[in-house]
Amino acid sequence: MEPGSQQQPSAPAQQPPPVGHQVVHVRTDSETDLEALFNAVMNPKNANLPQTLPMRMRKLPDSFFKQPQPEAKSHSRQASTDGGSAGALTPQHVRAHSSPASLQLAAVSPGALSPQGVVTGLAPPSAPHLRQSSYEIPDDVPLPPGWEMAKTPSGQRYFLNHIDQTTTWQDPRKAMLSQINVTAPTSPPVQQNIMTPTGPLPDGWEQALTPEGEAYFINHKNKSTSWLDPRLDPRFAMNQQRLSQNAPVKAPPALPPPSPQTGVLGSGGNQQMRLQQLQMEKERLRLKHQELLRQVRPQELALRSQIPPMEQDGGTQNPVCTTGISQELRTMTMNSSDPFLNSGTYHSRDESTESGLSMSSYSVPRTPDDFLNSVDEMDTGEAITQSTIPTQQNRFPDYLETLPGTNVDLGTLEGEAMNVEGEELMPSLQEALSSDILNDMETVLAATKLDKESFLTWL
């Protein structure tokens, strides 16, 4: 069987697995495979290495086996100069990001500046590093007449001279600046606001000289140095012209000696400013006061809610009636607002059928059915306001020890609502009762040993 036919069954395994599935390869005899790899390295002569074609027999181009020939230098920006000669090139270092005060440069010989702004007669520089190519001039500085600036696709600037129809990498404005700076007399560093034919320096600028005599300018406002004279900037020229036009208007006239009236008039601006400051301060104080009120108001409401209503309105009540009513209210509230707890005969402790969720552990009294009819015929009279009862309920623990013996568990009596069983039990009278009604109730309940029919009317 041919070797090609042995590989056909394994062809489906070469297909990529479906999306979301993984293929796991299991090597049954990995030790033999590893041993074969080691033998192939240790004994290359005995190993069955696959035969490979030599490099010469492969389909490779002829240039693969030949060394590249040195080609003639093409005309490029790196291998050319403005004059066209590329034989005497020397390395030139970029000074665009350097400080002009820390450079050691040779002075540039003066030359004649033509009316078009092009230097016509420059002496050969003493160093190959020309100052004109070491810094950048902003684009807003005007070019000499007849010149135009353009940029290459890579973003580098070059200049076109339409007078003689030539192009150059050198900025013609640098030649103008060097001519102006070199013609200045060599002297120690000049201080700020030097008077030159072009006028004084702007405010914050200072001119200084390097050890070689080159002039540079220091900007004290942003702490920077520049080779460019700020007086050549057209923006500075426009500012100077505007200042010169406004100078006569701004000149103050001679003022007479100040008098009290003129002093008051002269300080009108200060008074207006002071008034505005006071108004702003007043507004800030008002906002701060409102903020403090917003912070204090919740605390004040919380304190008021904690004070009982009886204590707040205690001064307006009649002191004579207060003691009697309070005693009756105590008696009534001790019994959970149920006047039938003091009867003794009808009260009995029943078996509790509650689920145990209630906090109360005492049973509710059962009122006999024959007594309910007589209660409906009684005159209830005027009722005391219900708002006073919850206030007295908070004082249960203070009076429970002084009560006479009843069937109520004093240790477990608390101020929470009782869970009652609806229809079988008489609902407690939550409304407060007057002293007359309480006396009538006690009279009726106390006559248990007498004949009930003499006191009650049955329907």
Curated annotation (Swiss-Prot):
Subcellular location: Cytoplasm; Nucleus; Cell junction, Tight junction; Cell membrane
Post-translational modification: Phosphorylated by lats1 and lats2; leading to cytoplasmic translocation and inactivation.
Record field: compositional bias (Pro residues): 250-260
Ranges of compositional bias, category Polar residues: 354-363
Pfam assignment, any one: WW
An annotated Gene Ontology molecular function: transcription coactivator activity
Cellular component aspect of the GO annotation: bicellular tight junction; cell-cell junction; cytoplasm; nucleus; plasma membrane
Gene3D superfamilies linked to this entry: 2.20.70.10, 6.20.430.10
Record keywords, A-Z: Activator, Cell junction, Cell membrane, Coiled coil, Cytoplasm, Membrane, Nucleus, Phosphoprotein, Repeat, Repressor, Tight junction, Transcription, Transcription regulation
Observed effect of gene inactivation: Incomplete epiboly at gastrulation, characterized by blastopore closure defects and impaired axis formation.
Compositional bias ranges of the Low complexity kind: 1-13
SUPFAM superfamilies, A to Z: WW domain
Ranges where the WW domain occurs: 141-174, 199-232
Span of the signal peptide: none
InterPro entries: TEADIR3_omega_loop (IPR053819), WW_dom (IPR001202), WW_dom_sf (IPR036020), YAP1 (IPR051583)
Coiled-coil features, chain-numbered ranges: 269-297
BP-aspect Gene Ontology terms: hippo signaling; positive regulation of transcription by RNA polymerase II
Residue segments, region Transactivation domain: 261-459
Subunit structure: Interacts with tead1.
Entry's family note: Belongs to the YAP1 family.
Function summary: Transcriptional regulator which can act both as a coactivator and a corepressor and is the critical downstream regulatory target in the Hippo signaling pathway that plays a pivotal role in organ size control and tumor suppression by restricting proliferation and promoting apoptosis. Plays a key role in tissue tension and 3D tissue shape by regulating cortical actomyosin network formation. Required for expansion of the neural plate and neural plate border zone progenitor pools. Acts as a direct regulator of pax3 expression via interaction with tead1.
Record's protein name: Transcriptional coactivator YAP1-A
Naturally occurring in which organism (per UniProt): Xenopus laevis (African clawed frog)
Organism placement in taxonomy: Eukaryota, Metazoa, Chordata, Craniata, Vertebrata
Gene symbol of the encoding locus: yap1-a
